[in-house]
């Protein structure tokens, strides 16, 4: 259960680590503990509610902040001292004032994190989702981005270590990104306060579990008395969905209701390649048998290449 292992690790390390970075298959949907299909935001929120956090604040660049921030400290940003990450040319630090109630600017939300992460009277978790669009690619960061990272790094380091706390889950930051490379190595590598967790695509057991959930959503042709999960080929159907996300499996079910009834094989080909017929099935045996001769008639002086093509085609056929 690859996804389940990832989520269990997140639940275990949130509150122990001061920063948890989640990357990989973060744009998918998942089956939660109640067997409901939810996105990552909903899954994390349910998990954090179970951990009894006082404040759960979610942020992305499009919608800004979601969640009750009435108990949080909100003031103007002040310059902070700290290590700047991925330095290129030095630039002047600039103060930023929180001017938008939705906190859509990264500098605004990072300032909010800095002011509240060290509050020992409340347990607060910040979920910051920028996927691909907050920091520059390739580890190159401009002055504002370096300042944001400085604020974040200082928030993590400034929280006092309390090893005798009665509540083991302390305030923390969860960062969501498609690619871990969006962060400079110096931010998370060899940093004991930062954990990186990669969400994989669903494994075989998880694909079967999803199919059990949405089986009624497939409209397919089967032999009499057979269904998607009660067929002599059920294991093949699950295996062929290797490397699919849960979203793609759900989309495939929707496609089955949009088209005329197809077999699972034809639906798979239509969804993945845009054609419901396998071109290899249309290839006549005689054509495969004589492919070397036919290619030699059209191409001169490429005997070695023709032999390689022949072997590849025969093997695939």
What would you call each of these model-derived segments?
Residues 150, 154, 307, 311-314:
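Short, contiguous clusters of charged residues that form electrostatic/catalytic patches at enzyme active sites
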Residues 138-140, 160-165, 270-274, 292-298:
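Generic detector of short, locally flexible boundary/turn motifs and exposed helical patches
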Residues 167, 210-213, 262-277, 300-305:
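Hydrophobic transmembrane alpha-helix bundles
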């Amino acid at each position: 259960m690859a996804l389940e292992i990832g989520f269990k690790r997140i639940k275990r390390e949130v509150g122990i680590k001061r920063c948890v970075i989640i990357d990989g298959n973060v744009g998918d949907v998942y089956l939660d503990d109640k067997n409901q299909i939810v996105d990552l935001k909903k899954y994390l929120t349910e998990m954090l509610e179970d951990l009894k956090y006082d404040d759960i604040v979610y942020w992305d660049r499009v919608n800004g902040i979601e969640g009750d921030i009435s108990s949080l400290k909100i003031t103007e940003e002040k310059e902070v001292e700290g290590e700047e990450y991925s330095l290129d040319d030095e630039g002047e630090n600039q103060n930023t004032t929180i001017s938008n109630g939705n906190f859509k600017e990264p500098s605004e939300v990072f300032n909010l994190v800095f002011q509240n992460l060290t509050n020992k009277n409340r347990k607060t978790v910040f979920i910051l989702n920028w996927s691909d669009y907050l920091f520059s690619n390739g580890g190159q960061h401009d002055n504002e981005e370096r300042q944001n990272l400085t604020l974040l790094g200082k928030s993590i380091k400034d929280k006092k270590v309390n090893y005798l706390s009665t509540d083991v889950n302390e305030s923390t930051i969860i960062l969501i990104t498609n690619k871990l490379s969006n962060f400079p190595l110096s931010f998370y590598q060899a940093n004991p306060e930062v954990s990186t967790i990669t969400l994989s695509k669903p494994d075989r057991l998880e694909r079967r579990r999803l199919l059990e959930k949405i089986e009624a959503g497939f409209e397919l042709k089967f032999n009499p008395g057979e269904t998607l999960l009660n067929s002599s080929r059920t294991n093949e159907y699950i295996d062929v969905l290797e490397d699919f996300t849960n979203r793609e499996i759900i989309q495939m079910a929707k496609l089955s209701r949009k088209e005329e009834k197809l077999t699972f094989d034809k639906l798979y080909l239509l969804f993945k390649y845009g054609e419901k017929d396998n071109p290899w099935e249309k290839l006549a045996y005689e054509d495969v048998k004589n492919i070397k001769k036919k290619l030699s008639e059209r191409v001169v002086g490429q005997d070695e290449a023709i032999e390689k093509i022949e072997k590849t085609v025969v093997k695939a056929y």
